[in-house]
Amino acid sequence: MSRVGKKPIEIPAGVTVTVNGNTVTVKGPKGELTRTFHPDMTITVEGNVITVTRPSDEKHHRALHGTTRSLLANMVEGVSKGYEKALELVGVGYRASKQGKKLVLSVGYSHPVEIEPEEGLEIEVPSQTKIIVKGADKQRVGELAANIRAVRPPEPYKGKGIRYEGELVRLKEGKTGK
């Protein structure tokens, strides 16, 4: 059996899980997430534990088993604790600010770049060079953070741009003059 797939998922207090066929709804203090899983996977809720079982040991069932369990665990953690991804701006004059819900980036273009977060996601700007993306859905938090980073990814010579917090940017050697 898949080592990831056979681990049961504990449901923390304040989180409710509803299974309707192959659609699972998880409600918690940070929000509500719904996802439809592959019909071959059997998801059962007993007390405060979720278990995922598979019909056979075929390769695609083994793969689906671990994936389904991980996605469910991420949903449960997302509605109870939430996810956040931090980004930092490196570069002279690179600034981030908030106008209402919109994130406004001035990162060396002739115009400020505005990014509107989707429903269920939140952007915080604790300082002009730091951005924090928060939300219950791990995938959507990561996707929004990646979209913000894509506005001005770190360049390889000086390292200027938007990077994830703690991301190491390998710098290249410049051309040596004669």
From Swiss-Prot:
Originating organism: Geobacillus stearothermophilus
rRNA-binding listed as a keyword: yes
SUPFAM superfamilies: Ribosomal protein L6
Pfam family of the protein (one): Ribosomal_L6
Family: Belongs to the universal ribosomal protein uL6 family.
Function according to Swiss-Prot or TrEMBL: It is located near the subunit interface in the base of the L7/L12 stalk, and near the tRNA binding site of the peptidyltransferase center. This protein binds to the 23S rRNA, and is important in its secondary structure.
PROSITE patterns cross-referenced by the UniProt entry: RIBOSOMAL_L6_1
Protein name as catalogued: Large ribosomal subunit protein uL6
Gene3D superfamilies reported in the protein's UniProt record: Ribosomal protein L6, alpha-beta domain
A Gene Ontology molecular function term of the record: structural constituent of ribosome
Keyword annotations of the record: Ribonucleoprotein, Ribosomal protein, RNA-binding, rRNA-binding
Gene Ontology biological process terms in this record: cytoplasmic translation
